[in-house]
Amino acid sequence: YIPLRQKKGPVPWHYALALFLSLIPLLLMKWSEVTTLSLFSFLGLSYLTFRVAQIIIETYDGLISSLSLPAFWAFLLFFPTFSAGPIDRSRRFEEDFRRRYTREEYLTLLGDGLEQLLIGLVYKFVLSALAFRLLSLCQPKGGLLLALAYGWCYGIYMFFDFAGYSRMAVGCAYILGVRTPGNFHLPFLSRDMKDFWNRWHITLSHWFRDYLFSRFLMRGIKGKWFKSRLSGACWAFLLNMLVMGAWHGLTLYYLLYGLYHGVLLAATEVYQKK
């Protein structure tokens, strides 16, 4: 798509076709999850799709004018983050890919990487295991208090399990000279739901914010789809989280999860703006 964009300019249907084609493997995989058909799936497909879609979107916007094949394939197949993120951006990645560190700079990066890797190991294999043991003691059918305790323990288990993996991925990336962004920042200290999604699975929520939420909202404002910017933001939150829920899985559970968070984010926006 990059050579076509350079030659023909920002042609909307070229962009739409390229973006749609990049999403086909992910759509087939999600469809196969809710049917008996095993159409298409492999490890890391979702995150590979995010990377390709980001390049196409930013190429159409004119933010990317060229991308060398070595940098392109290194970005797509970078093994520390290939299977489950964190989700990097191609322009930021390429800067690190081309950078030549001094000995002192790399030793600092190596130390930071080893620290992230060690913390990730403790999160994933010690604290996550302890949280899982607590989880096994709390049966959600044992009454309201036990159900609440189960919910809290499950949230803590999820955090240490995924944050541990993410820190290990970041640590490995640092060791290889790539400053991959982190995925979590004290999410349980969030002030509200908007703050929570700026702290939990950060690279995913920011990807959806930049490439779905903001674009839908700005298009709606320009097209006068909404009565006010506030109502537009509410609709954008609902769409954003529904799509995020569908990305997790095309099941009623995940769609309700997306709708629930969309409503909470919209309600937070209304409360803060009024």
Write out the residue ranges for each language-model feature:
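Membrane-embedded transmembrane alpha-helical bundles that form the catalytic cores
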Residues: Y1-K274
